[in-house]
């Protein structure tokens, strides 16, 4: 097999990054305020011979982000980048999602009095402008939506004790993102999170990946040689969907273990909260690709357990960053529900979902339900909606609550809608029809035989 034989970790818990219209890393990450960000200033030239403070691990410094704003950042780790021949520091921007953590050169840290004074002066001017603005009050619901959209990280104090303990343990294990970039196909992509690539691979600033077999390499020379030798031009497994240039392959983790392990290592670079397993055999992977004359190029995927005791129809879901905001995330979500319909079951993504995953699922659920409510005439229950869509009743209730379309009356949830309210929601860009939809006619798939037997007994 063309992919690597090293034992790798597999993602088994949803932390979906599906990427439909949500901000990318670094966008809208600061709390709402004036258009000009605090701390935006062209770095002044330090006086000749002006001493710099020594950078120490665990200390906090002002750091210039890629958008030229300055923020407090804790230095987590340092390294010598052998590929670039320079010293770098791994920083976490205080109060921001860990997705934005990055390796920076020393010249992006405010280490002299001249630079620190200039940043401080600019920040004070920003705060003065902010104080002159009319006071705005926001509701708890508005704050929740704001925090989801802008990736505001919860503090440990805002979590229950068990969650806080797990978060601290998770953060300690995955604190430093050594692999900073990957090259795959025609794209060079910044990594978002730590991924447990084995041995020396996990400490390289950059990895090269074959987009067909997903073999990962430390050196560009090895990568170029591999491209000339690799015979793969599509994922392994069975093609179960093809429409125009969109294709989906079903890959059994038991039959294609190394490919699926490599896929999970790739996905972990863009997914934070996951439980990692070494065994991919209990999972089936659905690989979404764009097809051209060169081959089938991986766009994203979702995985699901062959047997889910909790009724989950998705374990992990990801759209690779270059393909986000193009409708592929909602396509993957819709595809998972098409499979559930063929299985005559209801399903829900495994929790926890990432912030971006929550936004995409909520947007998809809202659109599906609004489309039904707009065209339906007569009496309709939440159970009816669940049977029609394969969405769980709990997910339907939470979605309708977010749309102010359900009330709790006499011990049960009651749908309360008007045609006008439905149309108003459908006019919103947030709930518009996805640009790419699943054509069930093009889906060539049936549930496994053991599941068909179970369904026939129900």
Curated annotation (Swiss-Prot):
GO terms, molecular function: acetyltransferase activity; enzyme binding; histone H4K16 acetyltransferase activity; histone H4K5 acetyltransferase activity; histone H4K8 acetyltransferase activity; promoter-specific chromatin binding; protein propionyltransferase activity; protein-lysine-acetyltransferase activity
Q: Specify which residues bind Zn(2+) according to the UniProt entry for this protein.
A: 210, 213, 226, 230
List where the motif Nuclear localization signal lies: 140-149
What is seen without this gene?
A: Early embryonic lethality caused by the absence of histone H4 acetylation at 'Lys-16' (H4K16ac). Embryos fail to develop beyond the expanded blastocyst stage and die at implantation. Conditional deletion cardiac and skeletal muscles is deleterious for tissues with high-energy consumption, triggering hypertrophic cardiomyopathy and cardiac failure in hearts. Cardiomyocytes show severe mitochondrial degeneration and deregulation of mitochondrial nutrient metabolism and oxidative phosphorylation pathways.
Tell me what controls its activity: The acetyltransferase activity is inhibited by anacardic acid derivatives.
In the UniProt annotation, what is the result of changing residue 274 to R? Abolished ability to acetylate proteins
The protein in question is named: Histone acetyltransferase KAT8
Q: Which organism is it from?
A: Mus musculus (Mouse)
Q: Which gene is the coding source of this polypeptide chain?
A: Kat8
């Amino acid at each position: 097999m063309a992919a690597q034989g090293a034992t790798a970790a597999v993602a088994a818990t949803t932390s979906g990054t599906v990427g439909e219209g949500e901000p990318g890393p670094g966008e809208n990450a600061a709390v709402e305020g004036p258009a000009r960000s605090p701390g935006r200033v062209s770095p002044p030239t330090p006086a000749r011979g002006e001493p710099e403070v020594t950078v120490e691990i665990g200390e906090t410094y002002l750091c210039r982000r890629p958008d030229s704003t300055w923020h407090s950042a804790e230095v987590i780790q340092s390294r010598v980048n052998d590929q670039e021949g320079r010293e770098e520091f791994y920083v976490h921007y205080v109060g921001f999602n860990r997705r934005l953590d990055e390796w920076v050169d020393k010249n992006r840290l405010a280490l002299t009095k001249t630079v620190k004074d200039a940043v401080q002066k600019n920040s004070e001017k920003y705060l003065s402008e902010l104080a002159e603005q009319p006071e705005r009050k926001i509701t708890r619901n508005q704050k929740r939506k704001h925090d989801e959209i802008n990736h505001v990280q919860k503090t440990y104090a805002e979590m229950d004790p068990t969650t806080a303990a797990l978060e601290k343990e998770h953060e300690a294990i995955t604190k430093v993102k050594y692999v900073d970039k990957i090259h795959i196909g025609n794209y060079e992509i910044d990594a978002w999170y730590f991924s447990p690539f084995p041995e020396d691979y996990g400490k390289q600033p950059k990895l090269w990946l074959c987009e067909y077999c997903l073999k990962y390499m430390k050196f560009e020379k090895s990568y170029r040689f591999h491209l000339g030798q690799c015979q793969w031009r599509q994922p392994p497994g069975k093609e179960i969907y093809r429409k125009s240039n969109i294709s989906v392959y079903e890959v059994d983790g038991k039959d294609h273990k190394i490919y699926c392990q490599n896929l999970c290592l790739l996905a972990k670079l863009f997914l934070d909260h996951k439980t990692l397993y070494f065994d991919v055999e209990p999972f089936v992977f659905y690989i979404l690709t764009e097809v051209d004359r060169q081959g089938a190029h991986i766009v994203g995927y979702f995985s699901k357990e062959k047997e889910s005791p909790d009724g989950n129809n998705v374990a992990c879901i990801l759209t690779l960053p270059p393909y986000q905001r193009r409708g592929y995330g909602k396509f993957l979500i819709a595809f998972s529900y098409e499979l559930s319909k063929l299985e005559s079951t209801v399903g829900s993504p495994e929790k926890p979902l990432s912030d971006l995953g929550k936004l995409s699922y909520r947007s998809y659920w809202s659109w599906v339900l609004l489309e039904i409510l707009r065209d339906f005439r007569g009496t309709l229950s939440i159970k009816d909606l669940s049977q029609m869509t394969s969405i769980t009743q709990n997910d339907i209730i939470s979605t309708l609550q977010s749309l102010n379309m359900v009330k709790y009356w006499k011990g049960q949830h009651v749908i309360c809608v008007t045609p006008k309210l439905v149309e108003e929601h459908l006019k919103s860009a947030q709930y518009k029809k996805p640009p790419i939809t699943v054509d069930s006619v093009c889906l060539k798939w049936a549930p496994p035989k053991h599941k068909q037997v179970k369904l026939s007994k129900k």
